[in-house]
């Protein structure tokens, strides 16, 4: 499972012109679910994201996690993160979990994230989403947990 996390000043997701999720300061999390991923894999990754210290503390160093920074989380499914890109000129999405299975796992991970953190917003699984953000820094990290 892979997550591309971005520290943002604000972010929102729109589907068909309607806002489905919106946060002010916090983390925009793009989540890619692999063929062999499980709920346990996802929980491990979510736990890491929640504890990952990429917000400035009182000394101006990356010492605070999203909770300590009083931020929110915008969680967006993105199967393209699982693409194999080493060969050729077209991404291979074979490593991504099939959509029907991925949707169920994504929904479980949203529920888990909400059980661990109060301010969680989401996109809509498999929808054509428009993501608006103001990246803070920019600060962007690619996190991965093996199944």
Curated annotation (Swiss-Prot):
InterPro entries: Daa-tRNA_deacyls_DTD (IPR003732), DTD-like_sf (IPR023509)
Motif range (Gly-cisPro motif, important for rejection of L-amino acids): 137-138
Claim: RNA-binding is one of the keywords in the record: yes
Listed Gene3D superfamilies: D-tyrosyl-tRNA(Tyr) deacylase
Catalytic activity, reaction form: glycyl-tRNA(Ala) + H2O = tRNA(Ala) + glycine + H(+); a D-aminoacyl-tRNA + H2O = a tRNA + a D-alpha-amino acid + H(+)
One MF annotation (Gene Ontology) recorded for this entry: Gly-tRNA(Ala) deacylase activity
Transmembrane segments: none
Lineage: superkingdom: Bacteria
tRNA-binding recorded as keyword: yes
GO BP: D-amino acid catabolic process
The enzyme's E.C. designation: 3.1.1.96
Keyword vocabulary terms for this entry: Cytoplasm, Hydrolase, RNA-binding, tRNA-binding
Compartments where found: Cytoplasm
GO cellular component, one term: cytoplasm
One Pfam match: Tyr_Deacylase
HAMAP family: Deacylase_Dtd
Family the UniProt entry places it in: Belongs to the DTD family.
Subunit: Homodimer.
Domain remark text: A Gly-cisPro motif from one monomer fits into the active site of the other monomer to allow specific chiral rejection of L-amino acids.
Function summary: An aminoacyl-tRNA editing enzyme that deacylates mischarged D-aminoacyl-tRNAs. Also deacylates mischarged glycyl-tRNA(Ala), protecting cells against glycine mischarging by AlaRS. Acts via tRNA-based rather than protein-based catalysis; rejects L-amino acids rather than detecting D-amino acids in the active site. By recycling D-aminoacyl-tRNA to D-amino acids and free tRNA molecules, this enzyme counteracts the toxicity associated with the formation of D-aminoacyl-tRNA entities in vivo and helps enforce protein L-homochirality.
Protein name: D-aminoacyl-tRNA deacylase
Organism (species): Acinetobacter baumannii (strain ATCC 17978 / DSM 105126 / CIP 53.77 / LMG 1025 / NCDC KC755 / 5377)
Classification lineage: Bacteria, Pseudomonadati, Pseudomonadota, Gammaproteobacteria, Moraxellales
């Amino acid at each position: 499972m892979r997550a591309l996390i971005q520290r943002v000043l604000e972010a929102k997701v729109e589907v068909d012109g309607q806002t489905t999720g919106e946060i002010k300061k916090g983390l925009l999390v793009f989540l890619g679910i692999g063929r062999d991923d499980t709920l346990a894999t996802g929980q491990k990754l979510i736990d890491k994201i929640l504890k990952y210290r990429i917000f400035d503390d009182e000394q101006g160093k990356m010492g605070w996690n999203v909770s300590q920074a009083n931020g929110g989380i915008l969680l967006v499914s993105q199967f393209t993160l699982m693409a194999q890109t080493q060969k050729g000129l077209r991404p291979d999405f074979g490593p991504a979990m099939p959509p029907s299975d991925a949707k169920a796992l994504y929904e479980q991970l949203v529920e888990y994230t909400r059980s661990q953190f109060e301010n969680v917003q989401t996109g809509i699984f498999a929808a054509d989403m428009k993501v608006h953000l103001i990246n803070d820094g920019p600060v962007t990290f690619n996190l991965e947990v093996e199944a």
